[in-house]
Amino acid sequence: MANEGGEWIMRGLAWDDPFRIRTWRELINYINQVGFLPLFANEVPGFSVEDHVSNLFWWTDDPEQDPWKWREIIAHTGEVAYGKFFNRKAGFVSLKWFPAFANYRRDGYDFDARWEDELASHRAKKIVDLFEENEELYSFECKKKVGFGKEGEKNFDGVITDLQMQGYIVVRDFRKRKRKKDGVEYGWLISVHTTPALHALRVGAFDRI
């Protein structure tokens, strides 16, 4: 994705290119084949979802063709890990590769050790600690429970992105809010977060994450 004259231009393959990824299932298979893959084009030519799909259906909300929609579907399946893993931007990591990926990003630290060595912020610790009692949380729930806001902690988006970059948090799903009185969904889809360990329990990847 490049900005040319104020207009965002998507890269991609021709519609009839035999190497084009055509479905979200094919994309999962490709991620498992290569190990990890950013969503958008970057400084490494050919190393992104964008480089392997058509540029015709981005943000059309078509589950059959829209790669932006595919990321929601794939996160929901849990078959690969999704989050802001690459230069603070979105991407995927296979469950087989995730332990090595996370170990590298964490410099070998689990979060408790990182905190003890004063390498983690108190804001990051507050977020990670939430998952000792919660299997998953909407992003707005994390924000509220930790006390981010005008009169409280600052830069929630930056902190939660740092935790994803370090492999401590992943995006489990995208869901709408539910009204308390009747459970009816409303509004935009919102990211739902969890830890890699809890994600592994959900999908049965006990030996992989």
Residue ranges, per PLM feature:
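Long, low-complexity intrinsically disordered regions
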Residues: 1-209
